[in-house]
Swiss-Prot record:
Chain positions recorded as ATP binding sites: G39, E40, N41, G42, A43, G44, K45, S46
Cross-referenced Gene3D superfamilies: P-loop containing nucleotide triphosphate hydrolases (3.40.50.300)
Residue ranges occupied by any ABC transporter domain in the UniProt entry: 7-243, 254-496
Alphabetized NCBIfam families for the sequence: PRK10762.1
Organismal lineage: Bacteria, Pseudomonadati, Pseudomonadota, Gammaproteobacteria, Pasteurellales
Organism from which the protein derives: Pasteurella multocida (strain Pm70)
Keywords on record: ATP-binding, Cell inner membrane, Cell membrane, Membrane, Nucleotide-binding, Repeat, Sugar transport, Translocase, Transport
Protein name, per record: Ribose import ATP-binding protein RbsA 1
Described function: Part of the ABC transporter complex RbsABC involved in ribose import. Responsible for energy coupling to the transport system.
A Pfam family per the record: ABC_tran
Cell location: Cell inner membrane
Amino acid sequence: MQHETLLHIQGIDKSFPGVKALSNACLSVYAGRAMALMGENGAGKSTLMKVLTGIYSKDAGTIEYLGKQVTFKGPKESQEAGISIIHQELNLVGNLTIAENIFLGREFVTPWGSIDWKKMHQEADKLLKRLGVSHSSHQLCSELSIGEQQMVEIAKALSFESKVIIMDEPTDALTDTETAALFKVIRELKAEKRGIVYISHRIKEIFEICDDVTVLRDGEFIGEKAVNVLDEDQLIEMMVGRRLDEQYPHLDKPRGELLLEVENLSGSGVHDVSFTLHRGEILGVSGLMGAGRTELMKVLYGALPRSSGKVRLAQQEIHNTCPQDGLNHGIVYISEDRKGDGLILGMSVKENMSLTALAYFSKSIQIDHKAEQLAVGDFITMFNIKTPSQEQQIGLLSGGNQQKVAIAKGLMTRPNVLILDEPTRGVDVGAKKEIYQLINEFKKEGLSIILVSSEMPEVLGMSDRILVMHEGRISAEFQRGEATQEKLLAAAIGKSAL
């Protein structure tokens, strides 16, 4: 069956100083169908979307939209033509209401020239209802969770009534309920003959909601296939050029002596938690969203206040009242929100990586920049970070490379305990494998690791021992050999282990 082509991108080339980002990149979007755009981090997906919407100019190639060749001069022009993009990074104004954010710059006006607040809120409420969001459009965006803010971004894109809607990692911060609501809307959009470009690293979502898939690798077009003729292994092989038969390369190594003891720890969202951690051990922490996993790590690290309990490191009791205390005691926390808490996107790779370790490069009151540069260079090589130079602005790197820099930044302080909170969120399958291999290297060197993850296969595949949290408490503990997804899920919802 032939489908109407809304958008056809052909033979796009784009180079930056020292880097060829796109080479003969292609993409077609069809009416009433969702096209997945897949590829590892750094494959060129975001660059191609920026060329399409006019943020970057192309070096070669053509863009046809609704049968006409076009070159957009910027996002405003492409949006007015009927191409909307939902960015992975939130772009909301916190002290404005939901309605004000949705219609910012496009406010409804009365015949008398004033803003028609009533109509604006009515239209915003309709969009929120369509997405299953229960909040009033009068609520400030600063009062919303990250997932709820993402739904506002989606509502904003829907308000344009676009022919083509590009969704860049739209479910990254969404709950299962919010994701189901989004998928319902995508199906409605397809029924209205809109075209969807769906960019995601969550392969299961591709098979659930998309009709076709286009794969880029190293900036080049690899192929376009109907989703129903592929399986997961074939799609992964297209993306990375090899099969990933062993996604979780667990290192079987005896753990060392007891390093960390947490006894009856309570604090913000955490109640009476006790556990231990040994040298060279990977301790997985599983649980549903809101179970208190991140809060526990932040209380342990000193980013959230502790109300009671004891923490002993190498048999010495410690009191982390702020993150600097955690760092001083050799505990490093790599946040789940690398862009909000972990990295400064406007600074360079070098500046980000060495920021918390400048004391190691200090000579009296001066920084030994040569030593800093050498150390950063070593980590770039060790972590296989793809960057033109140490001076590259980190916000221009792919998500996987940003995550590697965030982890390297923590390791520069030479910690005893490394807490990784959702270390592979928003990271493609190839970069995930590299991060898992790095984790095994850290383990081999005797580093103690706490791995917090929402992905049960990741926790099961990488951990030596697993804690499950429910409502701020430890609901179960499993040794590697006895844990299953069914047992983890049962403990996560508060049931007895199966």
